Amino acid sequence: MSYFKLIFSNKSILRTLQIEEFESEKLTGNCIEFGANAKIYRNFLKADHNLYKSTFSNLNSENKDIIKIDLEKKLLHKKKYDNVIIFNVLEHVSDINIALKNTNLLLKENGKLFGSTPFIYRIHAAPKDYSRYTKDFIKKSLKKSNYK
């Protein structure tokens, strides 16, 4: 990824670093990306886009092509995915354990969860941010939600 492209992509420094880290992942199969109005990460991946299909979920989207899945409610969506992408999503939910259990239910066996959550308030203080998590808390929550 060229830094020129990233600098002029209108992304924050945090988002730029996340994209840089994530772009090396080789995604295959079906993916669902939460909080993604504009296919944020798909646009930056070096992966062959013919090897995977993306679905996007955002509760606030008015785009009818973007499905609405509330990670804090009983999961009615039955489709399973090879990859779940949740960058900058967990800080917007009031119960991380329910959200992580639901993302796990969306994954096929041996599926992968990709994501991050900001730790410093001033770095990403979007509306309706509820929490900040330490690495240890995230690990404990993932284990509690049956992630391996």
Across the structure, where does each feature detected by a protein language model lie?
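Conserved N-terminal segment of class I S-adenosyl-L-methionine
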Residues: 1-79, 83
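Short conserved AdoMet
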Residues: 26, 46, 94, 108, ...
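A short beta-strand submotif of the Rossmann-like class I SAM-dependent methyltransferase core
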Residues: 83-89
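Hydrophobic adenine-recognition pocket in adenosine-nucleotide-binding enzymes
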Residues: 89-90, 119
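Short N-terminal helix/helix-N-cap motif within the alpha/beta-hydrolase-1
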Residues: 94-98, 125
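A short glycine-rich, Lys/Arg-flanked "PGG" loop and its adjoining helix->strand segment in the class I
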Residues: 97-112
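Conserved class I S-adenosyl-L-methionine
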Residues: 114-139
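Conserved S-adenosyl-L-methionine
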Residues: 146-148
